[in-house]
Amino acid sequence: MKHGWLNIDKPYGVSSGSVVGKLKKMLQCKVGHAGTLDPLATGVLPIAFGEATKTTNYATDTLKSYEVTIQWGEQRDTDDKEGKIIRTSTLRPTEHSIKEALQQYVGVIQQIPSTFSAIKVGGMRAYSLSRMGKEVALAPRSVCITEIELLSVDSGSNTADLRITCGKGVYVRAVARDLGITLGCYGYVARLRRTMVGPFTEANIVTLQELETLVGENKLEEAVFPLSIVMSGLPHIEIDVETAKVVKNGRNIRLVDAALNGLYIVENCDMCYLSQAGGVPVAICEVVDGTAKPVRVFNV
């Protein structure tokens, strides 16, 4: 099986890039991921391989969910437990005060990413500059948090567990930092696990060890999701074999003439996903006045 998606349970202490590197060796093909996880984070890391690497942005743009433990009383330069302590407080938030403060973080908010992030500043990663001791000034960004739920509060360990569901570009470490400042007690991420990226959840996750076993037993298909799993946000149009050949040669087609399933009227949408009958991927196309122009062709 040369194309598709895997839902990897990224282990603690391993970078997303390292996971990609291991899978390249294991699968012997092109591999990419949809959404970086910090080394200290665990959980859902969608991996595309083969022609599915052309669809990673569609997974990156989906909703994501995280479960995070915030440690109160300290602010750290990395906004997580691996950083240096830069401020402390003896104040501790109550469950009521946390719930009230969380309301400020739901919806479209302005967020300044962590200075220990992968954002590029003058051609260098922010975390590289920060580790060199250089001051990093990042501009606020508009991001969307759809839901924050307080799961538990532990007064003994001075921690709180939250579930955060959000869109693209949200830094959970920055949420912990800002929430601690709002509450006047400071805070940082002590534990972080991603539980969902669009269609990929903990219910359909696989560890690297489990995947290695499946590959060794020639059972990789048991863990593979089709390339089209991240295409649910686009209108899906089936075309015949001859029309598919035309599209794969880079030529435009009139959807009213080519569609097999009658979905050739694409309203309020400028993109569509084409496949042959049976689900064989053909292309992602730009739609203009009923004409589909291929922008990503799948060689499967």
From Swiss-Prot:
Record keywords: Isomerase, tRNA processing
GO biological process, one term: tRNA pseudouridine synthesis
Active site feature: D38
Catalytically driven reaction(s): uridine(55) in tRNA = pseudouridine(55) in tRNA
Enzyme's top EC category: isomerase
Protein EC: 5.4.99.25
GO MF annotation, one: tRNA pseudouridine(55) synthase activity
Keyword Isomerase set for record: yes
Stretches that traverse the bilayer: none
HAMAP family documented for this protein: TruB_bact
Annotated NCBIfam families: TruB (TIGR00431)
Family: Belongs to the pseudouridine synthase TruB family. Type 1 subfamily.
Name listed for the protein in its UniProt record: tRNA pseudouridine synthase B
